[in-house]
């Protein structure tokens, strides 16, 4: 509905982003696109693009530690996901300038970023209607820990030991 606003963690509709322009040129240009071209760069499409980029960068990060060009095990890829360090320079080089904020993850911090922004539907397209907001981690972290502790207790899960982090 026109005027509807949504909070976006990291990305939103980004049809002008370099990564989107590259997809349009290199995939859709030669006729290799499989979905509707007008969806490229929209919110759900960007969710997939960001997710795939994070997965690829996790494998790349794992290969930096465990051997470039080698097939990575699931444990090695997990290490890569837990040791991402995508600064603004790297995001820009990947074509993600303006799409998302820098992300740095660890074994203890799988979220990596606490930024969000609001975008609003104008009847034809999504437009950002705020700057980036950062969550107050003094409020969020205790809530996340309490929920995680409850879940682990309910499911009788054992937490990973700090030495298992391998960072």
Where are these regions (language model features)?
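Segments of small-molecule ligand-sensing domains
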Residues: 33-45, 52, 56-130
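Short, cationic low-complexity segments
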Residues: 133-161
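Extracellular/periplasmic periplasmic-binding protein-like sensory domains
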Residues: 1-50, 132-133, 147
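Sequence contexts marking disulfide-bonded cysteines in secreted/extracellular proteins
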Residues: 106-108, 162-167
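Short, charged N-terminal helix-start/capping segments
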Residues: 86-90, 160, 167
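Short, flexible coil/linker elements and helix-boundary hinge sites characteristic
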Residues: 28-29, 67-68, 85, 95, ...
């Amino acid at each position: 509905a026109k005027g509807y606003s949504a909070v976006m963690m990291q990305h939103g509709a980004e049809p002008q982003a370099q990564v989107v322009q590259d997809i349009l040129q290199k995939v859709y240009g030669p006729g290799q696109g499989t979905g509707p071209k007008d969806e490229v760069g929209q919110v759900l499409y960007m969710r997939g693009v960001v997710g795939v980029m994070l997965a690829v960068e996790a494998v790349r990060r794992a290969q930096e530690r465990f051997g470039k060009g080698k097939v990575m095990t699931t444990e090695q890829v997990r290490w890569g996901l837990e040791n991402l360090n995508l600064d603004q320079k790297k995001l820009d080089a990947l074509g993600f300038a303006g799409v998302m904020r820098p992300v740095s993850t660890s074994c203890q911090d799988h979220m990596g970023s606490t930024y969000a922004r609001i975008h609003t539907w104008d009847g034809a397209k999504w437009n950002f209607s705020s700057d980036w907001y950062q969550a107050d981690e003094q409020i969020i972290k205790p809530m996340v820990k309490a929920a995680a502790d409850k879940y682990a207790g309910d499911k009788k899960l054992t937490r990973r030991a700090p030495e298992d982090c391998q960072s």
